[in-house]
Amino acid sequence: MRRTSLVLIAVALSACSVGPRPIRYGEDECAHCRMRIMDPRFGAEAVTAKGRQMPMDSVECLLDWVAESDEGMRSLWVTDYSSKQLIAAETAIYLESEHLPSPMGAGVSAYATRELAEQALRDYPGRLLDWTELKASGLSVK
């Protein structure tokens, strides 16, 4: 009986962990710019310390929202341009290229691996950045 109770408690606690939720393209509104999120290659999401899931339409909006928010962040997510799946923002490699327009016009796309980013760089000249470099770049939608 005690073992069953411990298992049930563990299951309940794991259900409380909040990660990103799938972005509903064509329905969700960007938490930063309020535009409807349309392009599944560029979405992003912040999960606040309180578990609020804040969808964004681009990496640029995510950067601005995080910089302006007074809420603590639990996790940050960006969409891998290749697979269209949410990946951790801190581990992604970013391509900044004027040849690959993003929803807010800054030309930033995210990739799960350096190899994928380098493949995109061959098609869309620009520069590759990691999360720290991207945050320090001063990129903004303003």
PLM features: residue spans?
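Residue-level marker of regulatory loop/turn positions in helix-turn-helix DNA-binding domains and
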Residues: 22
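Thiol/selenol-based redox catalytic cores and closely related redox-interacting motifs
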Residues: 74-142
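C-terminal motif of bacterial Sec signal peptides marking the signal peptidase cleavage site
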Residues: 12-15
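Sec-dependent signal peptide recognition
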Residues: 2-9
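Bacterial signal peptide processing site
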Residues: 17-19
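Post-signal-peptide N-terminal segment of Sec-exported extracytoplasmic proteins
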Residues: 31-70
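Short, flexible active-site loop motifs that bind/organize anionic cofactors or intermediates
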Residues: 6, 51-52, 106-107
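Short metal-coordination and nucleic-acid-contact micro-motifs, chiefly zinc-binding Cys/His arrays
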Residues: 26
